[in-house]
Curated annotation (Swiss-Prot):
SUPFAM superfamilies: FMN-linked oxidoreductases
Gene giving rise to this polypeptide: lnbE
Enzyme Commission number(s) from the entry: 1.-.-.-
Similarity-based family: Belongs to the NADP-dependent oxidoreductase L4BD family.
UniProt name for this protein: NADP-dependent oxidoreductase lnbE
Length: 377
């Protein structure tokens, strides 16, 4: 019997032909003005070559002030929007779909880079990511509202650029996560101090984007189990259950969760149960989300583990399996998964090589793809 991994899935306005989702992958292939390089069009078009695929494009700054790393794309300038439009047109020409992940770094941005651009290192509170690291400035009420507006405008810009929707990056210790978790958020106003208050920033940002472009075009990524970049609060499960339940009311296109026991940086299973939780999983969060819309789960999947997740762990839920590194080196990954074709190994050293086409748009298609995929760039 065919795995659910290869069955259709409705995501917002997108009718996917399978459930193999491309993860948002930072690649540092944007120029000094945060405009994606021309080679990004080929890169994304290649990975859209199996019709009906959903790509979540790489984390993209909502404004220059929200950044802190060079060579990362943005979505605020006309030049950025125009280049992204070329990319989304190429993806749609393949019969596939593309969402854009919206990003603000907060306290984990590079303080020197921000200073050069005239910006402060900011966060929910004046708490550094680690001892000895730069101390961010706590955001004012006015700045919080400005950022909510920036996210909404970024969502509008993404739709203008042809994206089918946007995904709020609410995890991995970046700005939204810095409000959600009390390892960073020490505020005593209405943006901190309690579970509902810590959920508020993520919810208000998401609500603003929904009001801007519609709920069918908005999704959220959360990483409850992540303990990197100063995250994983002690009462994590109650905090994220509250947040997920609150987001559920907004009727989003999907919820994206990273699996436990997976390293955010390495995207591979960790050895042994972390923090004494041998049975950690996302089942409680998936249950809380209910049948609102699909849940995407990602992190370290093999073909076997992805099928097991959909067919055995969550047979009654609408689940998508998010793949990262295998999609880097296998542009026709859904086809290879379906037909059991061998994978091209990825080159870890080229993942984050700024501006380079090597290890980016030069991975080969399978021989079968040449015959079975009708259109390729």
């Amino acid at each position: 019997m065919m795995s659910k991994l290869f069955t259709p899935l409705q995501v917002g306005f997108c009718q996917l032909k399978h459930r193999v989702i491309m993860a948002p992958l930072t690649r540092f292939r944007a120029d000094d003005n945060n405009v994606p390089l021309p080679i990004a069009k080929e890169y994304y078009s290649q990975r859209a070559s199996v019709p009906g695929t959903l790509i979540i494009a790489e984390a993209t700054y909502i404004s220059l002030a929200a950044g802190g790393y060079p060579n990362v794309p943005g979505i605020w300038s006309p030049e950025q929007i125009a280049r992204w439009k070329e990319i989304t047109d190429a993806v749609h020409a393949q019969g596939s779909y593309i969402f854009l992940q919206l990003w603000a770094l907060g306290r984990v941005g590079d303080a020197d880079t921000l200073k050069q651009d005239g910006f402060d290192l900011i966060s929910s509170s004046a708490v550094p990511v680690d001892a000895g690291e730069p101390v961010p400035r706590a955001m004012t009420e006015e700045e919080i509202k400005q950022y909510i507006a920036l996210y909404a405008q970024a969502a509008r810009n993404a739709v203008m650029a042809g994206f089918d929707g946007v995904e709020l990056h609410g995890g991995n210790g970046y700005l939204v996560d810095q409000f959600t978790q009390d390892t960073c958020n020490r505020r005593t106003d209405s943006w901190g101090g309690s579970i509902p208050n810590r959920s508020r920033f993520a919810v208000e940002v998401t609500r603003a984007m929904v009001q801007a472009i519609g709920s069918e075009r908005v999704a959220v990524k959360l990483t409850p189990w992540n303990d990197q970049q100063g995250m994983k609060m002690k009462d994590m499960e109650q905090q994220f259950l509250h947040l997920i339940t609150s987001l559920k009311e907004l009727k989003l296109a999907y919820l994206h969760l990273t699996n436990p026991r997976v390293s955010v940086d390495e995207d591979v299973p960790l050895q042994g149960p972390p923090d004494g939780h041998p049975l950690e999983d996302n089942a409680g969060f998936v249950k809380a989300w209910g049948e609102t819309s699909p849940v995407f789960l990602g992190g370290g999947y093999t073909p076997q583990s992805a099928k097991h997740t959909l067919d055995v762990d969550y047979p009654l839920n609408e689940i998508g399996a998010v793949f990262g590194r295998l999609f880097i080196s296998n542009p026709d990954l859904p086809l290879r998964l379906r037909d059991g074709l061998p994978f091209t190994p990825y080159d870890r050293d080229s993942f984050y090589t700024p501006l380079s086409p090597i290890g980016y748009s030069d991975y080969p298609f399978s021989d079968q793809a040449v015959d079975l995929i009708p259109v390729r760039v």
